[in-house]
């Protein structure tokens, strides 16, 4: 209250003013006016002040200036009156010179001249966020407020009241290096007229040191933009706006650490839009917004990288004992800017003198303006001070006066009563960025929204509780009505929000109100969650920018003020929930954060600190009478009002009282909630019992009709009679039939696709499901009906007329399709090109399903050029006829044929039937019906076609109504059907065109529609067989090797596949059998070679051979003793006797050679002839097996020249690369070609470190699996060490595997090293892994498990004999071929050792957890041996029996714990009831916990009964083969 004024002066209290008067005016008046006497009966002067004490500050400005910045300030000193205002009824006030309009930007920096000594070093143990009175002798029975830290409140104790008052209401520019105790009018004018650019160009941007801002000139900013790839438009924008220095750095680090949004949106983006428009680039708002975000992130990184660490700051020398350190982890080197509770003010807090009569003096508002801002951190030197100088004049610091306030109705100095949510940190938690703590003290709403300079918020003057008699505050009008009533009930009247007992949630940081900040935040722009450590007090944590679980845990821990340790547990919770039993793991925590966290804080987490964590037992947000004191900056050190002689008992008593108060409040709260719940339940039950509506039972079978339903459904009856069925053909129909007879129209569908005819008594109807991809999965067996055209239009009738095409296949029920006219060509794109319709009619292309391998993707791109249009007009077919049309009179054209007799004959088989097939592939199209090929064929082609071992339809030239004659060749295992084009339909130009017509993917080796590979199905869907067999690869080379013309003759035929006399090559003279075979078997398998000429078998090898493999097929053909083959090859080439072969022919030749030399021989003891024995598919022969498979191995290419062939961009020709290098050895013998050419095809798999592609050795025609691993340092994010380790692991894998050769191990064929990748060539295995087969088809039968186990154990025994540990044996790493062969793969973590069954201490924990042996997990420095693979094999056997992995009910951690404790994987009960005891015994032997007692691979293979060969077993008869054979 002002002197001389009346206490009963009523007037309306306007909102709070924006800022206290300028510092210079305060100093000017304080220099000439003596201090006023204290008012009577209200305040009492502080004792011990002495005559030298500075005068107290004047009263703060009236609250009316909050919404009226023009209102002058009336505060004056002593008897100097202020000008009277409209609301001021005081009399006797002297006139005062008008004060210039206040410019907030001019006072955004710290006033110079305030020599504040640095704070003392914190030598004692730091406190946690929650204060415990028994830990610090300073606080005697008081609880400090925990909403804000006070680390950077740096005001010296030698500062006077005058300086404190002025610094709390005003700031001065850093550029004005003039002492603040001698201000002038010129300085005041310069401060008030400071512009935005000038202020920001100086170093007064909060959180940015001045040395950084001074170094960023405009040229440096432009160069920085150019270096970071910002466009010329951005550079021109910054030049035109002259953005540099602090203004530039503030774009990314100012304003709560998120950048100056106002400047970006009001200046930068509008100017950028103009520049982009003027330059012709065009304004793309989303793109430029993303660029803006990137720029702000880069700027923020610049500022943070230059932050001055606390370790570089000069410690303070003053020994005040009144400092507080409320951060449990705030040590000497901790940067307060990184803490979520970073203080918002940069000034030292003050310890306020205690007056005996509980009163103070009238000039208290400026000193105690910020008492309601929560602070609890120790005062120390500002971390942003340049060069860690103790001088507190810093760019980002604003000295404030005090941390205590008083109410006009109370004379006690203390903290306000607050709810747990009445602090900014309680609401924002750790969500406010690191710089926001410092920014909020110097920013206001206008600055945040408009991007202008720092001006204090109207809410910054929190001193509107004094100087008026009316208790109504303008800020209280913003509160909800309920909170205002609560505040009124507590205090007896509607108290000021800054007064004692206020419940107003006016949480702000040195002036920025919560409402202002929330208005600044974009709606929906941030994501919050609520966290609590005690179930009572919740902190709001901003998780908007959280991307990893580590960041999320750190943010929550920092928000709650607990250490970020590994033992912190998180639970889902709700309000009032007290039991938390199931903690969240990292994945669950991130999933809940992504799905439930929103702008309203729906996600609530209960955080349980680790048991040994130094956490206080009280929450940082507890309410109650919390009193906080700071260190005094307004009086000397001797005037500390805290009593140092307070006893330990008093502190303990205060602690006990505080705990009792918190417990009492908790019990009261729970009692109130319980009462409310009970009352709600009682009210609900009473209302239900008393006035509840009891409805009649609802009968859902007879629902009532809604009056809003449409009643038209009740009148669904025929509105007219059905038309009478036709009794006899009409005249028009007869005319159509007569015309159709002469033209020999064939039937088809309306859209140009062929539909099949079903003659009476032939086959059964085909369901429409054949249209889908499932028809590709029909069994591939010689006895099964061959696949044919799909019944896509079966619902429209099977007797549709239309356009069909010559086809060599039959339908699913062995019914041939009709040939089609040649005038339609489908218009579907092939490799970027389109097929055009010569008759310009609209085509009706069928949409291709995922499993439909239509020939439209297989035909050559220039296929349309070879189609000759037929000028003869043809119409579409007749109307659809139902399947039962033969029961009544026909309603459409009669296009039936008379059925001829079908004769079967058995022509002599021809070994060259593939080559004898005609080049006229007009009948080679598939049944999909997407192509219509001209009805053109030559007589020679007809004659050749008749000799094919296939079903052939011969169409006569007469054009009568009879079907072509049908002949079936039963000599082949798989019958195929083909249509030969009628000769009557061809034109004169057809001879040349048909001869030049390229082969379609459905070439002469295509036997069945069932065997056709649906590549889209196999590669893009979750099917087991992702590696097709060789037959499917050959027939679909276009799909697997895109961009290459596989039918163009580009490869010159050499003598690798054929000798001079044309006889096929011989297999390797070395018996390619495994070491487990007896000598008798070796002799039996080698007998087929005796019939070959000696010159063909004899071969000489040297150790220095570059091919590196004795089993190489190329070595088998090497004939050093004679130069005749080389000379004959040269003569043949020079004389034009050689021929070029296409890629398809090369692959087919290699495949045929492989099939020819895959011979089966019967065991001699059984006395069976080679023709009378049953071939066995068991590929691993043992001593008691009945047959052995002579395997033709792939060519190894180690140490050879490997060249990858890449087609040119505009040409599909293969580059000409010489493949022969003639050199002489010491004996003068010519060397064999050492150059291998290969093509890379489609991706067939990928893993952690690389990808697997399909490849083909163009030199030999063999298919390969190419494992390609990138070794580019950029692929490892610049981690060169990791890349070196990867390359070393690959080298070790190649070195280990290149010499291995076993039927049950995937062969390593070669290696090619490039600058950025390493390619490993592996043996191509068709099919998939056992693991994928289990997931697709379920568990295996015991006979299959026994066979696969024996094969896997055989390969494992071979590895152990070679000294190799696999260490990652599981079902996913065992490949299963379609013939039942198991092959061990994935040797990425295998290791070679000398003592295979001896424990190696260097063996680390490697492998998959659920397949690990106990000694791998609990090695304890002893290491382990190769017997870990035996344990893994037992897990694989259990996996095949159960259909799921071992330890299926356990997670990884639980499985590790149980394995380490010596437990074995449990065998499910359903498995134990179905398998034999021998199988259980085998698994128990593998699961021997003691590795010394665990059997070896050889022992199990040779002695265990489960590994005995079953002579009656055939994989082709198993249920598993029946499931997987239709996969292709």
UniProtKB/Swiss-Prot annotation:
Iron as UniProt keyword: no
Xref: SMART domains: S_TKc
Pfam families: Pkinase (PF00069)
Enzyme class: transferase
Superkingdom, natural source: Eukaryota
Region: Disordered, residue numbers: 1-84, 109-208, 303-418, 449-481, 607-652, 695-731, 746-786, 811-929, 943-1012, 1086-1191
Biased amino acid composition, Acidic residues: 917-928
Catalytic activity: L-seryl-[protein] + ATP = O-phospho-L-seryl-[protein] + ADP + H(+); L-threonyl-[protein] + ATP = O-phospho-L-threonyl-[protein] + ADP + H(+)
Single GO MF descriptor: MAP kinase activity
Pro residues bias: start-end ranges: 12-21, 53-64
Biased composition (Basic and acidic residues): 328-337, 642-652, 698-714, 1001-1012, 1142-1152
Residues annotated as domain Protein kinase: 1238-1507
Biased composition (Low complexity): 1-11, 22-31, 157-173, 396-408
Protein function: Mitogen-activated protein kinase kinase kinase; part of the MCK1-MKK2-MPS1 MAP kinase (MAPK) signal transduction cascade that is essential for appressorium formation, penetration and invasive growth. Beside its role in pathogenesis, the MPS1 cascade is active in conidiation and cellular stress responses. Targets downstream of the the MPS1-MAPK pathway include transcription factors MIG1 and SWI6, as well as GSK1 and MPG1.
Protein name, entry field: Mitogen-activated protein kinase kinae kinase MCK1
Organism: Pyricularia oryzae (strain 70-15 / ATCC MYA-4617 / FGSC 8958)
Lineage: Eukaryota, Fungi, Dikarya, Ascomycota, Pezizomycotina
């Amino acid at each position: 209250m002002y002197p001389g004024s009346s206490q009963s002066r009523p007037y309306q209290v306007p909102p709070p003013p924006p800022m206290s008067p300028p510092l210079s005016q305060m100093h000017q008046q304080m220099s000439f006016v003596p201090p006023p006497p204290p008012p009577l009966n209200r305040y009492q002067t502080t004792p011990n002040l002495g005559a030298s004490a500075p005068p107290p500050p004047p009263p703060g400005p009236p609250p009316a200036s909050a919404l009226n910045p023009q209102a002058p300030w009336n505060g004056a000193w002593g008897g100097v009156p202020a000008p009277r205002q409209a609301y001021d009824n005081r009399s006797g006030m002297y006139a005062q010179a008008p004060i210039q309009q206040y410019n907030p930007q001019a006072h955004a920096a710290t006033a110079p001249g305030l020599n504040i000594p640095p704070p003392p070093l914190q030598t004692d143990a730091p406190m946690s966020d929650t204060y415990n009175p028994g830990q610090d002798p300073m606080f005697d029975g008081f609880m400090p407020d925990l909403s804000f830290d006070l680390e950077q409140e740096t005001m010296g104790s030698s500062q006077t009241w005058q300086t404190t008052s002025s610094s709390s209401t005003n700031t001065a520019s850093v550029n004005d290096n003039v002492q603040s105790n001698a201000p002038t009018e010129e300085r005041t004018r310069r401060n008030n007229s400071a512009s935005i650019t000038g202020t920001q160009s100086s170093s007064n941007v909060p959180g940015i040191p001045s040395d950084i801002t001074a170094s960023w000139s405009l040229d440096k900013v432009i160069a920085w933009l150019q270096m970071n790839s910002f466009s010329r438009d951005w550079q021109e924008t910054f030049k035109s706006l002259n953005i540099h220095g602090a203004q530039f750095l503030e774009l990314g680090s100012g304003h709560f650490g998120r950048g100056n949004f106002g400047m970006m949106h009001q200046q930068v983006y509008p100017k950028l839009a103009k520049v982009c428009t003027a330059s012709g680039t065009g304004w793309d708002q989303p793109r430029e917004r993303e660029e803006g975000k990137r720029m702000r992130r880069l700027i923020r990184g610049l500022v943070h990288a230059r932050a001055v660490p606390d370790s570089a700051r000069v410690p303070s020398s003053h020994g005040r004992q009144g400092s507080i350190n409320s951060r449990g982890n705030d040590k000497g080197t901790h940067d307060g800017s990184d803490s979520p509770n970073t203080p918002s003010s940069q000034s030292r807090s003050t310890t306020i003198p205690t007056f005996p009569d509980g009163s103070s003096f009238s000039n208290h508002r400026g000193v105690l303006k910020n008492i309601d801002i929560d602070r609890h951190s120790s005062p120390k030197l500002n971390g942003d001070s340049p060069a860690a100088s103790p001088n507190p004049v810093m760019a980002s610091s604003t000295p404030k006066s005090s941390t205590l306030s008083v109410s006009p109705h109370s004379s006690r100095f203390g903290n306000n009563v607050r709810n747990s949510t009445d602090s900014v940190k309680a609401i924002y938690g750790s969500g406010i960025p690191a710089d926001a703590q410092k920014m909020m003290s110097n920013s206001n709403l206008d600055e945040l929204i408009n991007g202008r300079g720092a001006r204090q918020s109207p809410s910054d003057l929190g001193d509107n509780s004094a100087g008026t008699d009316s208790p109504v505050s303008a800020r209280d009008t913003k509160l909800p009505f309920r909170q205002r009533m609560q505040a009124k009930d507590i205090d007896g009247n509607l108290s000021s929000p800054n007064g004692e007992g206020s419940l107003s949630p006016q949480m702000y940081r040195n002036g920025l109100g919560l409402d202002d900040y929330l208005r600044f935040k974009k709606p929906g722009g941030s994501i919050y969650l609520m966290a609590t450590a005690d179930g009572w007090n919740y902190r709001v944590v901003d998780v908007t920018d959280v991307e990893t679980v580590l960041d999320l845990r750190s943010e929550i821990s920092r928000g709650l003020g607990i250490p970020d340790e590994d033992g912190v547990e998180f639970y889902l919770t709700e309000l009032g929930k007290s039991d938390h039993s199931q903690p969240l793991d990292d994945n669950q925590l991130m999933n809940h954060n992504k799905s439930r966290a929103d702008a309203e804080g729906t996600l609530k987490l209960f955080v349980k600190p680790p048991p040994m964590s130094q956490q206080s037992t009280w929450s940082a947000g507890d309410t109650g009478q919390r009193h906080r004191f700071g260190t005094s900056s307004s009086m000397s050190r001797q005037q500390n009002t805290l009593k140092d002689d307070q006893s330990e008992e008093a502190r303990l008593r205060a602690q006990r009282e505080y705990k009792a108060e918190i417990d009492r409040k908790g019990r009261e709260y729970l009692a109130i909630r319980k009462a409310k719940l009970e009352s709600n339940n009682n009210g609900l039950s009473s209302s239900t019992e008393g006035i509840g509506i009891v409805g009649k039972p609802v009968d859902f079978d007879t629902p009532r009709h809604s009056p809003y339903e449409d009643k038209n459904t009740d009148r669904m009856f025929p509105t007219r009679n059905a038309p009478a069925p036709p009794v006899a053909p009409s005249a028009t129909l007869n005319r159509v039939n007569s015309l159709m007879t002469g033209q020999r129209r064939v039937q088809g569908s309306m859209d140009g696709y062929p539909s099949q005819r079903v003659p009476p008594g032939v086959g059964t109807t085909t369901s429409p499901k054949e249209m889908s991809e499932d028809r590709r999965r029909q069994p591939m067996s010689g006895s099964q009906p061959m696949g044919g055209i799909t019944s896509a239009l079966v619902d429209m009738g099977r007797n549709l007329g239309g356009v069909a095409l010559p086809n060599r296949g039959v339908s699913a029920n062995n019914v041939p399709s009709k040939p089609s006219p040649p005038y339609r060509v489908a218009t579907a794109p092939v490799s970027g090109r389109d097929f055009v319709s010569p008759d310009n009619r609209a085509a009706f292309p069928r949409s291709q399903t995922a499993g439909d391998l239509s020939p439209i993707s297989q035909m050559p791109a220039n296929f349309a050029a070879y189609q000759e249009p037929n000028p003869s007009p043809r119409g579409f077919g007749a109307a659809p006829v139902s399947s039962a049309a033969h029961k009544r009179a026909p309603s459409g054209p009669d296009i039936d044929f008379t059925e001829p007799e079908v004769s079967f004959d058995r022509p002599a088989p021809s070994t060259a039937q593939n080559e004898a097939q005609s080049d006229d592939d007009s009948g080679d199209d598939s049944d999909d019906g997407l192509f219509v090929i001209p009805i053109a064929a030559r007589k020679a082609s007809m004659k050749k076609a008749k000799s094919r071992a296939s079903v052939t339809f011969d169409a006569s030239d007469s054009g009568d109504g009879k079907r072509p004659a049908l002949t079936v060749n039963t000599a082949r295992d798989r019958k195929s059907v083909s249509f030969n084009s009628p000769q009557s339909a061809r034109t004169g130009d057809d001879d040349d065109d048909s001869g030049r017509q390229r082969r379609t993917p459905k070439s002469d080796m295509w036997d069945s529609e069932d065997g056709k590979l649906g590549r889209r199905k196999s590669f893009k869907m979750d099917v087991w067989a992702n590696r097709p067999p060789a037959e499917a690869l050959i027939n679909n080379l276009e799909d697997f090797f895109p961009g290459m013309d596989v039918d163009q003759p580009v490869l010159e035929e050499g003598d690798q596949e054929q000798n001079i006399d044309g006889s096929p090559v011989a297999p390797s003279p070395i018996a390619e059998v495994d070491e487990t075979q007896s000598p008798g078997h070796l002799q039996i398998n080698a007998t087929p070679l005796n019939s070959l000429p000696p010159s063909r078998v004899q071969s000489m090898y040297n150790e220095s051979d570059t091919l590196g493999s004795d089993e190489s097929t190329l070595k088998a053909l090497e004939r050093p003793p004679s130069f005749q083959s080389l000379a004959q090859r040269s003569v043949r080439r020079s004389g034009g006797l050689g021929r070029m072969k296409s890629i398809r022919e090369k692959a087919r030749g290699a495949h045929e050679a492989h099939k020819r030399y895959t011979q089966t021989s019967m065991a001699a003891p059984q006395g069976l002839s080679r023709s009378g024995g049953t071939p066995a598919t068991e590929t691993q022969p043992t001593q008691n097996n009945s047959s052995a498979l002579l395997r033709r191995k792939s060519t190894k290419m180690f140490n050879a020249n490997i060249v990858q062939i890449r087609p040119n961009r505009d040409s599909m020709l293969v580059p000409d690369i010489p493949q022969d290098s003639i050199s002489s050895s010491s004996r003068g013998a010519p060397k064999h070609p050492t150059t291998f050419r290969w093509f890379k095809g489609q991706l067939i798999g990928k893993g952690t470190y690389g990808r697997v592609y399909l490849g083909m050795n163009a030199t030999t025609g063999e298919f390969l699996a190419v494992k390609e691993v990138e070794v580019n340092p950029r692929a490892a994010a610049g981690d060169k060490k990791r890349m070196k380790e990867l390359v070393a692991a690959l080298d070790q894998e190649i070195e280990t595997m290149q010499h291995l050769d076993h039927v049950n191990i995937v062969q390593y064929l070669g290696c090619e090293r490039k600058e950025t990748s390493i390619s490993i060539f592996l043996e191509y295995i068709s099919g998939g892994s056992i693991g994928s087969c289990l997931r697709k088809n379920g568990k295996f039968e015991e006979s299959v498990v026994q066979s696969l186990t024996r094969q896997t154990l055989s390969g494992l025994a071979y590895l152990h004999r070679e000294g190799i540990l696999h260490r990652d044996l599981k079902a996913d790493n065992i490949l299963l071929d379609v013939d039942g062969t198991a092959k061990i793969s994935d040797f990425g973590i295998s290791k070679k050792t000398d003592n295979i069954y001896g424990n190696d201490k260097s063996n680390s924990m490697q492998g998959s957890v659920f397949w690990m042996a106990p000694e791998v997990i609990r090695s304890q420095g002893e290491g382990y041996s190769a017997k870990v693979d035996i344990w893994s094999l037992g897990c694989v056997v259990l996996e095949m029996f159960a259909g799921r992995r071992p330890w299926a009910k356990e997670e990884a951690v639980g499985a590790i714990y149980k394995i380490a404790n010596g437990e074995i994987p449990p065998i499910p009960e359903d498995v134990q009831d179905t398998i034999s005891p021998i199988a259980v015994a085998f698994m128990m032997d593998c699961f021997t916990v003691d590795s010394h007692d665990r059997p070896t691979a050889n022992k199990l293979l040779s002695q265990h009964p489960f590994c005995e060969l079953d002579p009656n077993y055939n994989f082709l008869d198993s249920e598993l083969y029946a499931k997987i054979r239709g996969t292709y």
